[in-house]
């Protein structure tokens, strides 16, 4: 999957660089609770999913943060994911090095 509104970013987790803080363009489907793969929310009040790996998790924010995958978090025993409080202030997966050290429960 390509990036949405981010220029030349890769589709995989962690593939987006610093230029991915813009909003989503067309083709971003799904609501805030529907991301189960490596997707993140746009900066601001998120209303759709974006295939970039930088964006807003779990509500509104002014600074892009790195989201984690629900699947990766489950494998580390966290049980959280995008749309469930995944923001950079806390990190329950930090010691295990998963979820880009951004997962919080």
UniProtKB/Swiss-Prot annotation:
Region listing for 13 X 2 AA repeats of CG, in residue ranges? 4-83
**GO CC annotation terms, alphabetical:** intermediate filament
Keyword Repeat included in the entry's annotation:
yes
Q: What does the UniProt keyword field contain?
A: Keratin, Repeat
Q: What the protein does?
A: In the hair cortex, hair keratin intermediate filaments are embedded in an interfilamentous matrix, consisting of hair keratin-associated proteins (KRTAP), which are essential for the formation of a rigid and resistant hair shaft through their extensive disulfide bond cross-linking with abundant cysteine residues of hair keratins. The matrix proteins include the high-sulfur and high-glycine-tyrosine keratins.
- What further fact does the record state? Human have a similar number of genes as other primates despite the relative hairlessness of humans.
Q: Which family does it belong to?
A: Belongs to the KRTAP type 28 family.
Protein's name in the database: Small cysteine and glycine repeat-containing protein 6
Which organism's genome codes for this protein?
Homo sapiens
